[in-house]
Regions:
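ABC ATPase NBD coupling module
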Residues: 23, 78-95, 113, 121, ...
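Helix-to-loop junction immediately C-terminal to a conserved catalytic motif
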Residues: 57, 61, 359
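Conserved ABC transporter NBD signature motif
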Residues: 65-77, 367-375, 387
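Conserved ABC ATPase "signature" region
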Residues: 77, 129-148, 375, 426-443, ...
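Conserved ABC ATPase signature
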Residues: 152-157, 161, 448-452, 456
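ABC ATPase C-loop
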Residues: 165, 170-171, 460, 466
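A short, proline-enriched helix->beta-strand linker immediately N-terminal to the Walker B motif
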Residues: 172-176, 467-471, 487
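ABC ATPase "signature
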Residues: 235-239, 247, 530-534, 542
């Protein structure tokens, strides 16, 4: 590693203007990145980490501007450089992998064209050479069948595939510095590992430096030599990664270490807490069941799936030709009252399709889902209405699952009104209580989804799911969009509510790190089938399948605290 810094930020201040006032977003931030080095900026939403990164290449949103300080890249101060000089540095000097693949890919252009555009704009390749290089870059970013994928549009890609396309674009010009802004937040842990391994390989091969922006301290400590911890626009701690992980000095850093699921999953305290929650939840669930003679007569199993299969018709090369794609293949499991069963697997494993069949949103091709002894697909209108009240979902995407035209109050109050629960005043009190439970101020009630962060939106989705006091909650990647601190908070909330109300959870996730804190039983799915089913402890201590071992090995920072 060279003694001369590649990037040197000193006393950087960034402000945003609102109603004539200047609001500081980044305050006196200093950091250094050397050639070939990986430095991670860690912090929760709103800490200023992305603002710091975007100020380097003059891509601050809206009214954001650098008010003081210097940003020296390769000897040149970009804070004082002209627009043309900064644009010349982008791509070949500094590459960017942005966070949100939906808003950073053009929906009307093919993926291959968007990669070629980067290559041609920077004079790397043209024509056939650019087309071939686009395929190679997608392959490097971990995408199978890249030759076919380059001719597809962003809407034909899953979220993870779109993120890989952005990574291919960011690395296209072999930059000296790559700014990776939450580059794997949309990816499964195994793909996350593959992508980050690739970034590591690139760093060592080409001497490319990486500035990694993340909220996961476990991931940051595993991938970076140096950590910069930010809180409310300031750097609160900075130093070698392992030192910060094992001996955090600042209170906020200690909180991050305690909250990261990848690290918490290794602690025995997580296991002990889960055992206590299960014991209490099962007891409460039995009391609730005993109070209802109809329920008590059924069994301890609140949801039973038997030989579930779901096939989708895939359009062929001509309109009259189609093939069957089997998304779920002969899946059976039981969800006991007051417990949590986690379904774990990569994108495309069929876990969300199982969740939709349990919720009655998809009808199985064959097999059945029974809730309290009644088959969900055969419920009449009245039975289906009652079922909706007793089984509630928390969906994966907080952007798509909330109506943008509804205020937060109306969003949470709507299920109460639909099921004719309480007076208007009582419903308002319930909404306030639910917001408090998910750590949101009551002032949020008057706001709309577009005024909230992704994490806040997901907390609203959790509050809405709990509004009807359901017996079963189906959580489809319910915490994947959240910062680690909020993630830990929501997992604790779900545990507390389970113990208090005797709830049963079907927890869909790609992240085994989260599972240990919330689940009692685990089903591991791969390409539509269950490949392993066991208790959480058995899966963590003695996995029988190679695929499960791969998922466990992919948990970021898994062995750092032990080492």
């Amino acid at each position: 590693m060279s003694d001369k810094p590649l990037l040197e930020i000193e006393d950087l201040n960034v402000c945003f203007s609102s109603e004539g006032k200047k609001i500081p977003a980044v305050r006196d931030v200093s950091l250094t990145v050397y050639p070939g080095q990986t430095v991670a900026i860690v912090g929760e939403s709103g800490s200023g980490k992305s603002t710091t990164a975007h100020s380097i290449i003059d891509l601050l949103p809206g009214t954001g501007q650098v008010t003081s300080g210097s940003i020296r890249f390769d000897g040149k101060d970009l804070a004082k450089a002209s627009k043309r000089e900064v644009v010349a540095v982008r791509g070949s000097g500094i590459g960017l992998v942005p966070q949100d693949p939906m808003s950073n890919l053009n929906p009307v252009w093919k993926i291959g064209f968007q990669i070629r555009e980067t290559l041609e704009a920077n004079g790397i390749a043209k024509g056939k050479a650019a087309k071939q290089r686009a395929i190679e870059l997608l392959e490097e970013a971990g995408m199978s069948d890249a030759a076919r994928r380059v001719n597809q549009y962003p809407h034909e890609f899953s979220g993870g595939m779109r993120q890989r396309a952005l990574i291919a674009i960011g690395l296209a010009c072999r930059p000296k510095l790559l700014i990776a802004d939450e580059p794997t937040s949309a990816l499964d842990v195994t793909v996350q590992r593959q992508i980050l391994d690739h970034l590591d390989g690139l760093t060592s091969e080409l001497g490319t430096a990486v500035l990694l922006i993340t909220h996961d301290l476990g991931l940051a400590a595993e991938r970076a030599e140096h950590l910069v911890v930010m809180y409310r626009g300031k750097v609160v701690e900075s130093g070698p990664a392992l030192q910060i992980l094992r001996e955090p000095q600042h209170l906020y850093t200690k909180k991050l270490v305690n909250s990261a699921p990848s690290l918490a999953s290794q602690r025995l305290s997580s296991v002990r807490e889960r055992i206590a929650v299960r014991k209490q939840a099962v007891q409460v669930a039995e009391e609730v069941a005993a109070a209802d003679a109809e329920i008590a007569a059924v069994s301890d199993d609140v949801v039973v799936a038997q030989n579930l299969t779901k096939a989708f018709k895939i359009r062929g090369s001509t309109p009259w030709k189609s093939t069957d794609f089997v998304a779920v293949d002969d899946v059976s499991f039981r969800l006991k009252r007051g417990t949590t069963t986690a379904i774990v697997g990569e994108s495309g494993s069929g876990k969300s399709t199982v969740a939709q069949m349990v919720l009655g949103l998809l009808e199985p091709t064959s097999g059945s889902v029974t809730f309290d002894g009644r088959e969900v697909a055969k419920l009449d209108r009245k039975g289906a209405f009652a079922f909706r009240r007793r089984v509630q979902p928390i969906f994966q995407d907080p952007y798509g699952s909330l109506d943008p035209m509804y205020s937060i109050y109306r969003t949470i109050e709507e299920p109460l009104r639909t099921h004719k629960i309480g007076t208007a005043k009582e419903r308002e009190a319930t909404v306030r209580d639910l917001l408090d439970k998910v750590s949101l101020p009551s002032s949020v009630m008057r706001r709309y989804p577009n005024e909230l962060s992704g994490g806040q939106r997901q907390r609203v989705a959790v509050a809405r799911a709990l509004a009807l006091s359901p017996e079963v909650v189906v959580c489809d990647e319910a915490v994947s969009a959240l910062d680690v601190l909020v993630q830990a908070q929501i997992l604790k909330l779900l545990n507390d509510l389970q113990a208090e109300l005797g709830l049963s959870y079907l927890f869909i996730t790609h992240d085994l790190a989260v599972v240990r804190q919330i689940a009692d039983d685990v089903l591991v799915m791969q390409t539509g089938r269950i490949v392993e089913a066991a208790t959480t402890d058995e899966v963590f201590q003695n996995p029988t399948e190679e695929y499960t071992r791969r998922l466990l090995d992919a948990i970021p920072g898994r062995d750092l605290l032990a080492g």
